[in-house]
Regions:
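Acidic glycine-/aspartate-rich tracts in secreted/extracellular proteins
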Residues: 20-22, 32-34, 197-201
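Single conserved hydrophobic/aromatic residue that forms the stacking wall/gate
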Residues: 1-11
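Glycine-rich beta-alpha-beta "Rossmann" dinucleotide-binding loop(s) and their flanking helix/strand
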Residues: 26-47
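Short hydrophobic core segments
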Residues: 12-29
Length: 300
């Protein structure tokens, strides 16, 4: 991090590319950010910029699971002889379950007819998990449909919680704080329920597991979403581009008020893209490279 004795390096040409979590952390440790936060941890204010670490956005997802009647899921494919067969298949053909991504199927829906584009994405897998974090499968064949709100309105923050660069920053997601986010996710969960109960799936779906069939009201679904939901790990926005008081970089990705320092990563996105953030971040990097080259030419 650019802090203490290295603070003077800020005034040279620098490009910060630490991501939406660590870019604001490094800036704050370097004395660039909200003076109130910096002084709280004894950090000298080099440059006042209240927007650093604000405007945090991420996709929020809820896993809904069903038990499947037929033995056609990932559970059966990763046991005994089937697992040996799949391992050999991958070794010789580079195909099969060992090539599967986290979600093998996706779908996009509009939760309200008046909106022009989808506002929910489904991540679908032919498996359900007893413990998602440890990747332990359920004891029965299962299916997971995970609605994810694409354009959340809720905003959180990422800030340092000490002057020690080894300490992780405080991440406040503030998910589902806005009513539109709550309504959208609830509707997304209801649509997932309707998909799983469609006539075309009656020979496959045995029963609803989580949330179970007794959880039907909006309040119950929201409680389930709050308890079981999690991030999709698409953090953006904490050093946002713009011209308002909370903007951190200008339209050439330079720290506002510091012409020699740029931020080039997903943190500069003013709003979250309605999909994965990898490709947009590559675009940001390529655009920034062109800007840097243009600036070098103009300085010669």
């Amino acid at each position: 991090p650019i802090h203490s004795s290295a603070a003077s390096d800020v005034y040279k040409r620098q490009v910060l590319c630490a991501g939406a979590v660590q870019s604001p952390q490094i800036l704050e440790l370097s004395g660039i950010g909200n003076p109130n936060i910096l002084r709280q941890y004894g950090i000298e204010v080099v440059h006042s910029l209240p927007g650093v670490g604000e405007n945090y956005q991420d996709h929020y997802m809820v896993r809904q699971t069903w038990e499947i009647k037929k033995k056609i899921t990932l559970k059966e494919q990763t046991r005994g002889v089937s697992l040996i067969r799949e391992a050999l298949r991958y070794a010789f053909t580079r195909r099969g379950i060992m090539t599967y991504p986290a979600g093998i199927l996706a779908g996009f829906v509009r939760t309200r007819p008046e909106i022009a584009t989808p506002d929910v994405q489904y991540h679908i897998a032919h498996a359900s998990f007893l413990d998602v974090k440890k990747r332990i499968l359920d004891k029965h064949p299962g299916m997971t449909i995970s609605p994810c709100q694409l354009r959340p309105e809720s905003r959180g923050s990422i800030h340092i919680k000490s002057s020690n660069p080894e300490d992780q920053p405080a991440i406040k997601g503030n998910f589902l704080a806005e009513e539109i986010d709550r309504r959208t996710l609830i509707e997304g969960m209801k649509i997932a329920k309707r998909i799983a109960s469609a006539p075309a799936l009656k020979d496959f779906v045995a029963k609803e597991l989580n949330p179970n069939e007794e959880i039907q009201s909006d309040d119950e679904l929201l409680d389930f979403a709050r308890e079981r939901g999690n991030t999709v790990y698409h953090p953006v926005g904490t050093c946002k581009m713009g011209s308002d008081p909370k903007a951190v970089v200008d339209d050439r990705l330079r720290i506002i008020g510091m012409q020699s320092l740029r931020v080039v990563d997903a943190s500069i996105m003013p709003t979250l893209t309605s999909g994965n953030t990898n490709a947009p971040t590559i675009m940001i990097a390529e655009k920034a490279a062109d800007m840097i080259k243009e600036d070098e030419v103009s300085l010669r």
